[in-house]
Amino acid sequence: MRSLPFFCRGQVVRGFGRGSKQLGIPTANFPEQVVDNLPADVSTGIYYGWASVGSGDVHKMVVSIGWNPYYKNVKKSMETHIIHTFKEDFYGEILNVAIVGYLRPEKNFDSLESLISAIQGDIEEAKKQLDLPEHLKLKDDNFFQVSKGKIMNGH
């Protein structure tokens, strides 16, 4: 994908509530206008990168972009799992994301357990990839230092 790394930010909105409740893997969801403005060559699938909430620390993350076939979503979504434990929810805060690599396409699963297992595998692979020097340097990108109040797509 020519668009990677891809930088975007937007206000965290409520999703379906499945990430925490059903999967044990909480996600922060972008509003529709952020998803609708993704570059055409950013295909659906699972990606990895860096994320921060507001002006907070930058953490590793995985993000699902698409329709989540297991749940048969009718609207395209962008759901970010930040690999960090937060003390409380952060709905309404600005989420800053740098997508740096692609893991796999979206696919359906025959059970909730196999979906959870795949996501856990994605998280482990993302951790490894983000430790590589070419990805690690993006953690300190100026994108995470600029004014956090501006909602934008692109860099």
From Swiss-Prot:
It is found in: Cytoplasm. Zinc or magnesium. ATP binds at residues 15, 21, 27, 29, 82, 84, 91. The keyword Acetylation does not apply. Its main location: cytoplasm. GO terms for biological process: apoptotic process; flavin adenine dinucleotide biosynthetic process; FMN biosynthetic process; reactive oxygen species metabolic process; riboflavin biosynthetic process; riboflavin metabolic process. Monomer. Directly interacts with TNFRSF1A death domain; this interaction may be supported by TRADD. In the absence of TNFRSF1A, interacts with TRADD. Independently of TNFRSF1A, interacts with the NADPH oxidase subunit CYBA. This is Riboflavin kinase. It comes from Mus musculus (Mouse). The gene is Rfk.
